[in-house]
Amino acid sequence: MPMDFSTFLTQINDALNAENGPNLAYLLRPTSPHGKDLLKSFRSPTASTLAHFKGSITSPWDEIAIQYVLICSHIARLRPGEAFKEQSQLVSLFFRFFIENRGWTLPALFSILRDLRDLAHDADWHAKVHNQNTECMVEAARTVAKAFSSCMTDRLSPPDESRKWGVYYVVGLAMKCYFKVKRISLTKNIIKVLDNSSDIPALEFYPRSHQVTYRYYLGMLSFLNEEYEKAEQELTLAFYHCHIQAHDNQARILAYLIPLRILKGHLPSDELMYRFPVLADIFSPFVAAIRAGDLAAYERALELREARLIELNLLLTLEKGRELCMRGLFRRVWLAADKGTRIPISMFHAALLISGMKDIEVEEAECLVANMVYKGFMRGYISHEKQMVVLAANNAFPRPAERPAPLASL
């Protein structure tokens, strides 16, 4: 049966009295079926035509209900900018109620903040298409940050009913907004507050989905700052805690975890690449080149995928993977020399020429070998006078992951 506005108000009131957060979230969601039902009751709803409903239920819920109708109306008329403004006002009204209540309100908070972010995305996209400039996502991020403060400052609720149980979900949403508008540095303020807060539950006690989102963005922040050890740690935890059916989220994490593992010499299996064909298209050529020690193939893969790698912020990381490829090439030289401990530099020079570095001089080849020794990819030293590479009798080519701080020296 279609819902009229009086029934809508009654159901909101019932949800409030029962402290039913999930139902309240459902009632405030613009995509819920009753949104279209309510519009049938009003031809062209405006704040003034709906003003007489103020006082119908306790404040601020009378105004929130009116805002909801206005939001649905703007969405139906494909006006995302106006819908975003009304949703922002709805969130502000909700905050007045939220800060005076306990954690049962969190499902509704999460829902209206998600809708705010989605409408901000739609509004910015719509403006861009029409050659206009808007910063709705930036405004959304500021609003979400206010929600974070409202969650953190709950001092009165019992621990199991605290608004603090919303902290990591809200932080994850704020980080999504900041990453979307490329204002990543703003995430550091929130992380600093979390790190300095001793009165919130440990991360592992929060819902797993909250943990995964937070660790993913923490890993991404470390990745972009070239703090590769911490990035690998956080992304690994995010991946192994990610729901097995959340295939897209797993792929999103692996897009950055795989190159970090490659830099340590841990190449992805064929089975993993089969499960994620989009990632296989990006990484398989690099993996094949590293296994073959084929520098030319590695360079071709970089060139062909340059635009995509720049878009994903992966170009610099995979450029560093050349050293893994060079290690593979030099190891093949060592194998061709029957694993000898004394190999002329000329052999490494010849291998580089064959691999596509056609203009390289012997002196440059010597420098490349010296660099591989310095970074721990090879064990030995160079006799410059005799133009000879003297390799260790045992473990001349250690596994990349066995090098001291294998990511720190990249």
What are these regions (language model features)?
Residues G172-K176, M220, P259, V287:
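Amphipathic alpha-helical repeat scaffolds
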Residues A108-L109, L113-L116, V171, H210, ...:
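TPR repeat positional signature
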Residues L116, A120-A123, Y178, R215, ...:
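Residue at a conserved register position within TPR or TPR-like alpha-solenoid repeats
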Residues M1-P107, R114-R117, K128, A141-K164, ...:
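Charged, E/D/K/R/S-rich low-complexity terminal regions of large eukaryotic assembly subunits
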Residues D122-W125, N133, K180-R183, L224, ...:
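Alpha-helix C-terminal capping/termination sites
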